[in-house]
Amino acid sequence: MEPAGPAPGRLGPLLFCLLLSASCFCAGASGKELKVTQADKSVSVAAGDSATLNCTVSSLTPVGPIKWFKGEGQNRSPIYSFIGGEHFPRITNVSDATKRNNMDFSICISNVTPEDAGTYYCVKFQKGIVEPDTEIKSGGGTTLYVLAKPSSPEVSGPDSRGSPGQTVNFTCKSYGFSPRNITLKWLKDGKELSHLETTISSKSNVSYNISSTVSVKLSPEDIHSRVICEVAHVTLEGRPLNGTANFSNIIRVSPTLKITQQPLTPASQVNLTCQVQKFYPKALQLNWLENGNLSRTDKPEHFTDNRDGTYNYTSLFLVNSSAHREDVVFTCQVEHDSQPAITENHTVRAFAHSSSGGSMETIPDNNAYYNWNVFIGVGVACALLVVLLMAALYLLRIKQKKAKGSTSSTRLHEPEKNAREITQIQDTNDINDITYADLNLPKEKKPAPRVPEPNNHTEYASIETGKLPRPEDTLTYADLDMVHLNRAQPTPKPEPSFSEYASVQVQRK
């Protein structure tokens, strides 16, 4: 009797167990021999280029697919599979699929972006009959570095302007560079700054950003200054990128005020000048106040440039002094760059008004300027006094010359006083026999000696009287209207006489 065979219903499970045991044995035996090799530990490419990731296996058994993953562990993500039917944009198989027993499973990533940076793994799977494929071997991984250039540095300053003496911060930022290594430094007018803080951040270790802040103390000379943020990276090939910021955009220099005046004009007007000096920027409004009341507003458009970058502005204000009978305070008020107004005062003091009109005296706030005006006034007064004195002396001298040239005096001298000069006396008892008249003619400058001329003459005067004088008369006056001058040829003399006499002969009855 032949033994009975296995029941038909039990044959299926038995075959399945045998096949499973054989598969496990074959997998164990071949697992010891299978090798997955990724020859390149790292690959670096520039953004936009293509990157090739190599992978080879030592055996095609056990049967199962090969897949590529980015990352490892639970966070890894599949990027490519050699099983047909799946589509992966930008990734292609670079192996020769027509080659028999092809063991090359390399891939190529085109148009690489910084987000593609990371570590990639080539993994061998064993195909499962019932269960999913099982990972049996992985390569060592290839790190992809995307060489991304940093963006141009962006430099920003404070939101509002600062004054000299204040400390302000500048910030420099650059984005999207890879790898992480980067160098950043600050320069001011060619000199490197040291007070800075720099941080580097990344987004999933794909690309990096850098931010740096530097502190600078402002000075009045910084209007023409600027700061430079310099970034150096391997992708720049020795040509660093620069970002700049000008101090002229963040500095404010407040003006100084000075009021001066010119002397009072004949039209009773005073010219006041407000000098606004060394300010920056140009944003300026000037107001003239009269005793606190707005009188005029200037919004200048033309300025005087200084070498240090600041500006000057001068405003003129004409004051009609005759319209004021009391002291007036004029104020120069300046509003600069939306800052609180600064002021400078100037007092104009009224003089006592006369019937012909009034006048005013300007009293500057500056004592030195006032003293200078006093010195000028004293000097002018002294000069006028000297001129008046010289004019008076000149007029007096002219008057004396006219008096000498237009008048002459004739006087009769008593004979007793001139007795020694009389050559002949007719009667000693009559004192009125002969009377001499002294003609004091104006003396002229003594002329230079010259040769006597034959026409030199002597002048005589004869006086006729109608009656005899009384004995008691001692003086006889001669009316010049009765004097007749006769010319006669005199004997030449070596030198002319300076006194002329007229002999008068009185006839007796």
From Swiss-Prot:
Residues of the Ig-like V-type domain: 32-138
| Record keywords | Disulfide bond, Glycoprotein, Immunoglobulin domain, Membrane, Phosphoprotein, Repeat, SH3-binding, Signal, Transmembrane, Transmembrane helix
- Where does the record say carbohydrate is attached? N54, N93, N169, N181, N205, N209, N242, N246, N271, N293, N312, N320, N345
Which cysteine pairs are covalently linked by disulfides here? C55-C122, C172-C229, C274-C332
Q: Which domain of life is it from?
A: Eukaryota
Which intervals of this chain are the motif SH3-binding?
A: 446-451
PTM remark: N-glycosylated. Phosphorylated on tyrosine residues in response to insulin, cell adhesion or epidermal growth factors. Dephosphorylated by PTPN11.
List residues of the Ig-like C1-type domain: 150-248, 255-349
In what way does this protein cross or attach to the membrane? Answer: Single-pass type I membrane protein
Q: In which tissues is it expressed?
A: Highly expressed in brain, spleen, lung, liver and kidney. Detected at lower levels in heart. Highly expressed in alveolar and peritoneal macrophages, and at lower levels in dendritic cells.
Renumbered to this chain, region (Disordered) spans: 441-472, 485-509
Give me the stretches of Polar residues compositional bias: 500-509
Gene Ontology MF, one = protein tyrosine kinase binding
Please give the annotated consequence of changing Y436F: Abolishes tyrosine phosphorylation and PTPN11 binding
Q: How does it assemble?
A: Binds PTPN11 when tyrosine-phosphorylated, except in macrophages, where it primarily binds PTPN6. Binds GRB2 in vitro. Binds FGR. Binds JAK2 irrespective of its phosphorylation status and forms a stable complex. Binds SCAP1 and/or SCAP2. The resulting complex recruits FYB1. Binds PTK2B. Interacts with TRIM2.
> What does the record give as the function of this protein?
Immunoglobulin-like cell surface receptor for CD47. Acts as docking protein and induces translocation of PTPN6, PTPN11 and other binding partners from the cytosol to the plasma membrane. Supports adhesion of cerebellar neurons, neurite outgrowth and glial cell attachment. May play a key role in intracellular signaling during synaptogenesis and in synaptic function. Involved in the negative regulation of receptor tyrosine kinase-coupled cellular responses induced by cell adhesion, growth factors or insulin.
Query: What is the recorded name of this protein?
Result: Tyrosine-protein phosphatase non-receptor type substrate 1
From which source organism is this entry? Rattus norvegicus (Rat)
Q: What is the lineage of its organism?
A: Eukaryota, Metazoa, Chordata, Craniata, Vertebrata
Gene transcribed to yield this protein: Sirpa
